[in-house]
Amino acid sequence: MKKAKWLCTAAAVLALSVAVAGCGGSDDKKAADSKGGPKGDVMVYTSIYPDIIDKMCKPNVAKAFPDMKVTWFQGGTEKVITKITGEIKANKIGTDVLMVADPSYYLTLQDQGLLLDYVSPNLKDVITDKDKNGAWSSVRVCNMIIAYNSDKLKPEDAPKSWKDLTDPKWKGKIAMPNPMLSGTAYVAVGALADKYGWEYFDQLKANDIRVEEGNSAIQNKLLTGEYAAAMILEENVLKLANTKNEPLKVSYPEDGVIIIPSPIAIFKATKNPEGAKALVDWWLSKDGQQAVVQGWMHSV
């Protein structure tokens, strides 16, 4: 029921254009400074891409918290969920903070009483989904869009909508991420099923859509021309187009960009609650949200 609630929410926020929220309030609270700041170890489980962790997360967090050691475990959302599920069964949760892209999972954890209620002073600036008691809050927004290779397709010839992907002219030439591995793909599937019914995916199957392990595999095969167009995260396309001048282009679907709020939460089992809270404060602050934007995602 909780997943169904979030999937319906995702369908409700199918937008005709990309909404870019502000990067925190002007009076956001600084999480810490070099004097009297949080100390100790904090573990973060996240689905943020490894290169973004290395180039954006680690240096910014290290600068904000010089006396705190933050360790990152990265994996696809469903891989992280599988890891946590095993840890819960063993009564040995290994992380303090969670940042993955399956919003419904946070509701499951909250129902199980596993999340720490913490109302960050910056929570008031979050305009996307959040829990009023602070058990979780959106920290970044991911957009699922259609992408194509502009060396292979002219803009006027590219798919203009999700429904366009069912056109027989794209048979065997389209792809999507595996929703069993990708949290954003999972939410996208729910949103499209809610909008068009499950027969939409029967049509995609008949059109020989290929299911790849993740967004990175899709971007690479778009570049080689193996696929003409694909469902993919906007951030993948923007990063390649702007940093490597690759010929990938975004087609914002006329029947709605799928906007996916991705939350942050603290486990009650944390061994360093003050450090974990400081990290949440930072992510929801202006500095943290600017770091999100540097990672080609959208702020909350």
What residue ranges belong to the model's regions?
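Short, low-complexity disordered leader/linker segments with a strong preference
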Residues: 1-41
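Short, polar/charged alpha-helical segment
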Residues: 37-38, 43-71, 79-82, 146, ...
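Extracytoplasmic ligand-binding site segments that recognize negatively charged/polar headgroups
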Residues: 47-55, 73, 77-78, 93-227
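Periplasmic-binding protein-like
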Residues: 53, 142, 172-180, 203-204, 211-212, 246-268, 282-300
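Short amphipathic alpha-helical coupling segments at ligand-binding clamshell hinges
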Residues: 57, 200-203, 262, 271-283, ...
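A ligand-binding cleft/hinge motif common to bilobed small-molecule-binding domains
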Residues: 104-108, 228-247
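A bilobed periplasmic-binding-protein/Venus flytrap-type ligand-binding module shared by bacterial periplasmic
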Residues: 147-152, 190, 260-273, 291-292
